[in-house]
Amino acid sequence: MTLTPFAVPEYTAADFSQETWWLSLIKAVFIIVFLIANVLLALWVERRGLGRMQTRPGPNVAGPLGLFQAFADAGKLLFKEDMWTRRAERFLYFLAPAIAAFAAFSVYAVIPMGPNVSIFGHSTPLQLADMPVASLYILAIASLGLYGIVLGGWSTRSTLPLYGAVRSSAQVISYELAMGLSLVSVFLMSGTMSTSQIVAAQGQFWWAFTLFPAFVIYCISATGEVNRLPFDLPEAEGEIVAGHMTEYSSMKFGWYYLSEYVNMLNVSAVATTMFFGGWHAPWPLSHVEFLNSGWWGMLWFFLKIWFFMFLLIWTRATLLRFRYDQFMNLGWKRLMPIALGWLVLVALVRGVTQFVQLSTPILFGSVGVLFLVALVIIWVTDKPEPEPIPASEREYTGFEDGFPVPPLPGQTPVASPRARATIEGTLATATATATATATASAIDNPKEGTDE
């Protein structure tokens, strides 16, 4: 018996045949304006939303409902005094915020925001550029933004910013690997790494449901990628003030702050493109043909990215910060093995479906359910690691990992050798005195004999 593979469907890529230089310029300017406008909206929505979730009003002074609060904050940053540390590496100190902002704004260059539309008589897709490896471009640019954080923390020659930079590099390495593995399953199912073709592949069903475990892994990893609660260890206020941004002021701090919110929009756009059908209308509106054409796609794309933005804001309002060891264990001991296991399953099923005609959504849905059930069983039966004994309950020796440390509340300080010798000498003297006193008392007061 000879097994003949079925033809892999090829999805239509974005058509840039009528693209001109001025159309590309208009799109580039539009993307910058779109991102800045959405950052201003995100600041207002987040602060008002957090206020409602925490039973407080939120910003309500600058303009109606506090709508102009973000503009007031931006103006304040523009006119603040520009300061830096005396020992800072000036060139890298000024360059680092620019690198972070450039990397953040560059991701949207390959994000399809809508189908082909007519602009001044030219048919062009609502996408600045596309390439066969556009998804790899997104991952590469996201990694480039890490240099802005690391260089910013190191160039200040200050302790807390350096701690934040090191934490951020460890965090990105830990979670970007899991995020990349979750996207590989999308590449296998779509048969391409072009973002426009990945969106075209989701015309009938979204990968968020077919590849649900990969979608969950991406959402968790993306939250860690943008340093948001519960993964905001590089900027933990109670531990290292503001992390790598501690020694920055004025608009250099503003660039970092802007890039953080643009990165939130970036991970939301990537989630929309890879898992939520891109600019396609949601079911059941997707069956109406004109709702999947023209400028309607822009509306669906906008609503979908704001769905993910709301999830990021919601998690910040409800979840607590992870402890650092819990955070690293989740990335390396949980997400990485799960992502690898799911990728192997996707590759096997994808290979089978090339030789056997099966319904892909039903097949992957059933495999995904079985995979999740297996994970739940493993999670329930897995014995938790013993919690470390708090330092306040451990025997205090005066040293921790070879370094002298002061005692914590509840611990008894260890006496120095001189104090110990003094205490031992005093105790010996007191013991000898007590013994002599008891002996003298026994001699002076002998026991009376018994009557016979």
What are these regions (language model features)?
Residues 2-434, 438-452:
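Selective transmembrane helix interface/packing segments
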